[in-house]
Amino acid sequence: MKQENEMSVTVGSKAAGIGSAGRRGKAIRSDLWVQLEARSRGGIELDLSSRVEAYYGDAIRTQVEEVLAALGVTDARVRLEDAGALPFVIQARLEAAVLAAGVAPEADARPARTAALPPPPPRARMRRSRLYLPGNEPKFFISAGLYEPDGIILDLEDSVHPDAKPAARLVVRNALRCVDFGSAERMVRINHLPLGLEDLVAVVPEGPDMILIPKVETADQVREVDAAIDRILENSAAADRPLWLMPILESALGIESAFEIACASPRIAAITIGLEDYSADLGVPKTEEGAESAWARQRLVNAAKAADVQAIDSVYGQVDDLEGLKRWGERSRGMGYEGMGCVHPRQIRVIHEAFRPPAAQIEKALKIVAAYEQARAEGRGVVSLGSKMIDPPVVKQAQTLVEQARALGLAGADADEDTRPLDGDTGSEANR
């Protein structure tokens, strides 16, 4: 998603007892800029400028007073420039400004949860598309689910200015409590370690579905994140909720360690590659054809399959080139990838089409599964389709394809109801 150029740097701009947070400027919307000066007396003095003053001015003032009281701030001069921020954003910006002013909050002032936690996604759920949303730009959050990506990524890493990361962390935390992202899997890309450990403390208790770990080069880095999650969840309401991991491999060393990384934690559901950083690490430009990264991309697929996790491709950065995106997506699927990232909503439909199984493949898979079911019903160990014997790996691949087709509405749910994976002793004699 494109970021606005007009912004004020947030947490980090603080003088003695003065802190600011948020973003302001003519191009800014759905956000709030706050400057807070802590005082020893005098109560709360508010100076509010809001584009929605006529409708929500009083409500904003009331919320500001309530949040400050909850944080234990009783004496402060507060200046606010509001561009239509929602309550969860107002709370996050106020808390960030209080922290930037050097005031330690006296209590938990998180907003009440207004978005119900969706059912936890299965480890192997469909992940064709994942839409990146800059974590410090809440204007993108509200409508993101309407575009129906398989996943949304609240990004705390590359899309967020270093000085704004503490403030963005609070916005993302609150979004997980207050924004309905529809059917999308709710992912958070943390910062690379060690800063990412601070991100985990903020977001893990809110029940995200997946954590993306950037710039992973060793299995130990994954294990460090895994152990941190265990500690955070120990006394959390989200302790019984599965939390999946997706390491991002962005260097030559990361690719060389792909299999070890993919096996580093039972929480890992997928691994992916970051092509911009990978190409930079090689010292070569990233090209549309991708010849410079073809080996690494195939190496990652092989490692993922060997570890029984999903292989997810990188983003296609040319937002306006939808034909190029389609070609890239089709090649990606042909390499064994199960999805890819996207940086703009217009890419989602093209990606879904690129990763849609062709009708001929679905038809063949249905026939293979039907032949397997018939062989099992007749007590035969050999699966055949016509005069051709079908090996167990082929049946398993067909079952996976049928399940995917059903999820997409491309195959009837009543066709070949029992598609349980093959046991090791069932199947063709051809390879024995």
Language model region names:
Residues M1-P122, N431-R432:
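N-terminal intrinsically disordered, cationic/polar leader segments
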Residues A92-A96, A100-R432:
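Expand to "…catalyze enediolate/carbanion chemistry for C-C bond making/breaking, isomerization
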